């Protein structure tokens, strides 16, 4: 207790007071550990009171490092201390809560804590290490210069606990190290880590693994710094790269034993991968040593993995790290695969993978085999089987990682991969034949893995066989392997995979062979089959429908459709969640095969889908799959009448039910389904949809306080207005209000300043559709809507809401420019100036952030029209407005930290509106050019690399690479995204109103280029060009201005 007494004295508090607080703290900690709930709750309240006292942290530190203290109290004190440091040590911290620890207390805590790193109890030691590292993040080197000397002394002390404690601090500290600390850290830490890593006789495997992990963390960090400060790597890491690399090469060759195991090799491989990724130029010379050794690790690990995991013919103990985490052997396999991915990502090393493809793919297939553990889990839990084997699974196993690697090489080297895979599969199948004949039971797993591999990349295989680029006996594979395996009963997983594989290769089959496989697939659905076979049969059916629709040979499927439908409905009745989703997805595609068949079965399909939708009403995935089925049924005219008779009353009763009587979210989903039906039905719509569903959705939207219901209600009314405005306008209620009146009520509600701003996220689309369809009939109402939009804009904070509102004005620029300008000039904005100024300021400050291809086109072309009008009509209303131009940075400011930003708020230039519009148009052109260029850079271009200059140290190539993505700001990447096709896959492309708009078809790059070229010819252009910056001039140069 001497340390505690000294601390009490140091803190300047009189002994008894300090002692009293400390005793209170011990009592409180004891209370928190109590099994009695009331006592615990009271103690947790009490700790909040003590937390704000000056001595709280000091007492926690004393209790933590007191070897005489009770173990439970010490552990709890160490955990609370760790939290205390996070929240009170430094006011700059994101988690900070006042008060800040006083200087006096900090000195005492820094004095006490390092003793805890020698602690024999690992949990206490780890918590102390965490606290020391968190303090060091703020205090080292200025306030705690001696810390690193202390840690280094511990590392060489020979005391195992002290070594572990110090390594824990360094591990945590380097993860959070700042770029101002790194130049001080790297020269001290890295040489020490090298010593620890290479002194196998002094330090244990886990400590040496930690040393490598710390090296890897530093390597990544220094690479990130290099982007901002050129030359950082040269000073901080290059001096040690060579010696580390040589040591890594040595370490990978040591067989497992007292100084090496799979966990250790995994860390070493991660380090080598980090070097290859971050400093490829520096690694070129070492590659000849590294590659054969990693290759050996890959091949030896494969044999070991097959024995211990796939076939489980050999028991092994997995290593455990110093925190008790099990380091499964699969982690080593993951890091080998990561290394290969890193080679693929770099043009310097890519061709090494290309040369090794036949062997590499042979081993990938070994790693793709099903393990005994998976057989056990999947047999017991079919849901898990569906989830793990799904293309978009979140599971991560060696099998999945091997598939990922196969797909990566197949994408990068299509022709070579096809040949390599054909050769590897042929070799495996021949070897499996020998294994099978010798009576070994696991031969089928290789068959399954070969089918999985070939089926995963089926397109490159079938194309290459068709073009004669590879010699692969496709017919032999289909009949002697897949069909033959279907007649064996070795494993349900082989049967299932064979059904799936067959469905991938219909293009290579004769109609007779397809029929044989379809017969087998339908039998596979049968209730007597194991779940895994039935599930695989469902996947196969999806494949057949998909493939045979593409090749226009669905007639082969027709005779099997009745039994397929029955099989699917039976299966859905027996399973929920994952299996059910798969069945629904497949049922949906089955509905599209033959409209006549689907119509004849509507009485089965529709009631089933409604029942499933109601039973799983709280599952959004099931709801959306049910919606897809209703969509398909709506598009078949013969199904429309009967389906609406069944479905619409159900949806109406949900919309009319009191909110507390139905599950949350059900009403919003019901409205969504109604929208789908309306959108996919050809007008005129039935009485049921107009006289029952329309009023129900309008009333429901007006009387709900649920955001999702309001949003979906607005979208549903937009569908009605878009599909059949006349019918909406003709219908009226008993009071004589017609459908348009109701739509107006809903618009007002969505824009009401009192409702949440998120209800307005789609209101812009509703208003724009309303204006485009009913423009002239709106009269006074239009002014009313626009006023509401202006007031909503003054409260909106979210970009999506603001964009939705501004888009209404953008659409009006296209259709009613002059009336719009008049209207906006007749109203005052929030500052008293005309509302036009407010709208243009909001629009121009956000245009570069807008997302969505369609929105991008509408707003960009509208800006062109505004600029053109402002010049041609010499319109003072636009010419006199000034808006924010560009941010002004002072030259001596350096890096803009939070504290600097607080002292010096942002400053902007102030420029004429029309100049700002020109700048935005140029920016849009730049973005769309970049997106188009990226889209045209097909993978074929990337894989043309000259293998002969492989090892040459190319300065230029390096420069180009570094200026690639690394130099882009996140904002740039986000800005270009609105024109990237695949960025918003589900965005407006499926919005029918956008698709119908001629603006959507515009080639924006051509339009903007043309506009700017014409604009540059105008006499006024001289005045504009003086305002352009270098970037903008460069963009204009690319189009010849």
Curated annotation (Swiss-Prot):
Keywords for the protein's UniProt record, in alphabetical order: Acetylation, Chaperone, Cytoplasm, Nucleus, Protein transport, Transport
GO process terms (BP): proteasome localization; protein import into nucleus
Any GO MF annotation of the entry: small GTPase binding
Ranges for domain Importin N-terminal: 43-119
Signal peptide: none
Record's subcellular location: Cytoplasm; Nucleus
Cellular compartments per GO CC: cytoplasm; cytosol; membrane; nuclear envelope; nucleoplasm
Biased composition (Acidic residues): 943-964
PTM annotation (N-acetylalanine): residues: 2
Region of interest (Disordered), residue spans: 936-967
UniProt cross-references to PANTHER family, sorted A to Z: IMPORTIN-7, 8, 11, IMPORTIN-9
Entry protein name: Importin-9
Gene assigned in the entry: IPO9
């Amino acid at each position: 207790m001497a340390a505690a007494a000294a601390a009490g004295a140091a803190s300047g508090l009189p002994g008894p007071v300090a002692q009293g607080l400390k005793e209170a703290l011990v009592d409180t900690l004891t209370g928190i550990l109590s099994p009695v709930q009331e006592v615990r709750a009271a103690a947790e309240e009490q700790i909040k009171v003590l937390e704000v006292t000056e001595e709280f942290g000091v007492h926690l530190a004393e209790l933590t490092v007191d070897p005489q203290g009770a173990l439970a109290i010490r552990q709890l004190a160490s955990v609370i201390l760790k939290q205390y440091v996070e929240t009170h040590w430094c006011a700059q911290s994101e988690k900070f809560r006042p008060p800040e620890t006083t200087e006096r207390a900090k000195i005492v805590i820094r004095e006490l804590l390092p003793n805890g790193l020698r602690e024999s109890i690992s949990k206490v030691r780890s918590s102390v290490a965490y606290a020391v590292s968190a303090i060091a993040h703020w205090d080292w080197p200025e306030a705690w210069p001696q810390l690193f000397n202390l840690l280094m002394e511990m590392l060489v002390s020979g005391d195992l606990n002290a070594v572990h404690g110090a390594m824990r601090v360094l591990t945590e500290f380097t993860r959070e190290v700042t770029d101002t600390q790194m130049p001080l850290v790297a020269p001290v830490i890295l040489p020490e880590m090298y010593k620890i890593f290479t002194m196998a006789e002094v330090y244990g495997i886990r400590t040496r693994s930690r040393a490598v992990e710390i090296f890897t963390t530093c390597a990544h960090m220094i690479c990130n710094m290099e982007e901002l400060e050129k030359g950082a790597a040269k000073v901080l890491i290059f001096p040690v790269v060579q010696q580390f690399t040589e040591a890594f090469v040595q370490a990978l060759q040591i067989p497992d034993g007292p100084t090496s195991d799979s966990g250790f090799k995994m860390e070493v491989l991660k380090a080598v991968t980090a070097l290859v990724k971050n400093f490829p130029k520096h690694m070129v010379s070492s590659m000849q040593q590294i590659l054969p050794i990693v290759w050996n690790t890959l091949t030896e690990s494969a044999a070991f993995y097959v024995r211990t995991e796939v076939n489980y013919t050999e028991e092994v103990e997995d290593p455990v790290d110093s925190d008790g985490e099990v380091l499964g052997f699969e982690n080593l396999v993951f890091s080998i695969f990561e290394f290969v991915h890193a080679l693929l990502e770099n043009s310097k090393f890519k061709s090494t993978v290309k040369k090794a493809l036949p062997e590499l793919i042979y081993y990938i297939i070994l790693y793709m085999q099903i393990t005994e553990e998976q057989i056990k889990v999947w047999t017991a839990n079919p849901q898990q089987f569906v989830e793990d084997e799904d293309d978009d699974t979140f599971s991560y196993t060696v099998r999945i990682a091997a598939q990922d690697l196969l797909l990566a090489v197949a994408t990068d080297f299509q022709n070579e991969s096809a040949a390599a895979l054909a050769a590897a599969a042929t070799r495996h199948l021949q070897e499996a034949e020998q294994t099978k004949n010798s009576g070994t039971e696991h031969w089928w797993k290789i068959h399954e893995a070969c089918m999985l591999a070939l089926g995963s990349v089926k397109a490159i295989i079938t194309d290459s066989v068709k073009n004669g680029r590879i010699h692969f006996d496709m017919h032999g594979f289909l009949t002697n392997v897949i069909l033959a395996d279907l007649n064996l009963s070795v494993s349900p997983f082989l049967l299932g995979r064979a059904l799936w594989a067959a469905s991938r290769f219909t293009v290579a089959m004769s109609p007779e062979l397809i029929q044989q496989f379809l017969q087998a697939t339908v039998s596979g659905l049968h209730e007597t089959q194991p779940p895994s076979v039935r599930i695989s049969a469902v996947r196969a059916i999806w494949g057949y429908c998909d493939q045979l629709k593409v090749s226009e040979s669905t007639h082969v499927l027709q005779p099997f459709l009745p039994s397929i439908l029955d099989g699917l409905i039976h299966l859905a009745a027996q399973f929920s969640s994952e299996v059910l989703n798969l069945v629904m997805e497949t049922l949906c595609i089955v509905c599209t095969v033959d409209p006549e068949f689907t119509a004849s079965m509507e009485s089965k399909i529709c009631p089933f889908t409604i029942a499933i939708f109601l039973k799983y009403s709280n599952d959004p995935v099931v709801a959306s799959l049910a919606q897809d089925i209703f969509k398909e049924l709506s598009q078949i005219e013969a199904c429309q009448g009967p389906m609406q008779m069944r479905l619409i009353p159900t949806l109406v009763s949900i919309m009319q039910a009191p909110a507390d009587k139905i599950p949350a979210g059900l009403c919003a989903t019901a409205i969504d389904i109604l929208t789908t039906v309306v959108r996919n039905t050809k007008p005129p719509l039935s009485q049921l949809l107009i006289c029952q569903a329309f009023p129900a959705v309008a009333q429901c939207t007006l009387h709900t306080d649920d955001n999702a219901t309001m949003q979906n209600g607005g979208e549903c009314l937009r569908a009605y207005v878009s599909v059949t405005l006349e019918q909406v306008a003709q219908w009226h209620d008993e009071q004589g209000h017609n459908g348009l009146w109701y739509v107006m009520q809903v618009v007002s509600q969505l824009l009401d300043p009192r409702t949440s701003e998120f209800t307005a996220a789609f209101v812009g689309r509703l208003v724009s559709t309303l204006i485009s369809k009913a423009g002239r009939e709106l009269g006074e109402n239009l002014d009313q809507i626009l006023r509401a939009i202006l007031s909503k804009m003054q409260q909106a904070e979210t970009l999506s809401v603001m964009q939705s509102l501004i888009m209404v004005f953008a659409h009006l620029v296209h259709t009613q420019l002059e009336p719009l300008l008049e209207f906006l000039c007749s109203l005052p904005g929030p500052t008293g100036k005309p509302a036009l100024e407010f709208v243009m300021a909001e629009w121009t400050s956000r245009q570069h952030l807008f997302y969505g291809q369609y929105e991008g086109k509408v707003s960009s072309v509208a800006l062109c029209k505004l600029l053109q009008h402002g010049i041609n009509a010499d319109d003072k209303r636009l010419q006199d407005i000034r808006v924010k131009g560009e941010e002004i940075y002072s030259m001596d400011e350096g890096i803009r930290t939070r504290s600097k930003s607080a002292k010096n708020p942002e400053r902007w230039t102030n420029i004429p509106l029309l100049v700002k519009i020109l700048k935005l148009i140029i920016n849009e052109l730049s973005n769309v050019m970049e997106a188009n260029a990226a889209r045209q850079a097909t993978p074929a271009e990337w894989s043309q690399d000259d293998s002969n200059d492989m090892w040459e140290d190319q300065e230029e190539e390096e420069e180009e690479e570094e200026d690639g993505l690394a130099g882009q700001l996140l904002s740039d990447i986000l800005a270009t995204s609105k024109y990237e096709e695949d960025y918003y896959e589900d965005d407006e492309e499926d919005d029918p109103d956008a698709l119908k708009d001629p603006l959507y078809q515009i080639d924006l790059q051509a339009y903007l280029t043309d506009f700017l070229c014409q604009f540059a010819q105008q006499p006024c252009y001289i005045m504009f060009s003086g305002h352009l910056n270098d970037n903008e001039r460069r963009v204009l140069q690319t189009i010849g201005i």
